Amino acid sequence: MSKRTFQPNNRRRARTHGFRLRMRTRAGRSILSARRSKGRSQLSA
């Protein structure tokens, strides 16, 4: 039996996909603006 690949960890989740990480780069900011224009209720992790 192989182990499950998803091992939940909220801190790691926020640090790799979080809002502040998205705001750091130009590409990340474009992702956020795209999600805003689409009307997503949750912008990032």
Curated annotation (Swiss-Prot):
<dbReference type="Pfam" id="PF00468">
    <property type="entry name" value="Ribosomal_L34"/>
</dbReference>
<dbReference type="GO" id="GO:1990904">
    <property type="term" value="C:ribonucleoprotein complex"/>
</dbReference>
<protein>
    <recommendedName>
        <fullName>Large ribosomal subunit protein bL34</fullName>
    </recommendedName>
</protein>
<feature type="region of interest" description="Disordered">
    <location>
        <begin position="26"/>
        <end position="45"/>
    </location>
</feature>
<comment type="similarity">
    <text>Belongs to the bacterial ribosomal protein bL34 family.</text>
</comment>
<dbReference type="GO" id="GO:0006412">
    <property type="term" value="P:translation"/>
</dbReference>
<keyword id="KW-0689">Ribosomal protein</keyword>
<dbReference type="InterPro" id="IPR020939">
    <property type="entry name" value="Ribosomal_bL34_CS"/>
</dbReference>
<dbReference type="GO" id="GO:0005840">
    <property type="term" value="C:ribosome"/>
</dbReference>
<dbReference type="InterPro" id="IPR000271">
    <property type="entry name" value="Ribosomal_bL34"/>
</dbReference>
<dbReference type="GO" id="GO:0003735">
    <property type="term" value="F:structural constituent of ribosome"/>
</dbReference>
<keyword id="KW-0687">Ribonucleoprotein</keyword>
